[in-house]
């Protein structure tokens, strides 16, 4: 199964996986608004030998089949690092 991966301009580390490139009709309006304008990253074969770095290929496939999309949120650790960094000012 091929999927299209997009990154968010609004939130670093937020990625959207959908089955068909540029077909955002499956997304709820609230998600479209929160995600912002999607920036295409790549097409990815979820059943190929390569694995995704921050999420599981099978989980992405299951979510796409169930919901039409998979939303990868930023790591919590990245958020904590940002707070620690701002406190060092």
UniProtKB/Swiss-Prot annotation:
HAMAP family for this protein: UPF0745
Pfam families tied to this protein: YcgL
Alphabetical list of PANTHER family matching this protein: PROTEIN YCGL
Taxonomic source organism: Actinobacillus succinogenes (strain ATCC 55618 / DSM 22257 / CCUG 43843 / 130Z)
InterPro entries attached to this UniProt entry: YcgL-like_sf, YcgL_dom
Protein name as annotated: YcgL domain-containing protein Asuc_1390
Residues in YcgL domain copies: 1-85
Top-level division of the source organism's lineage: Bacteria
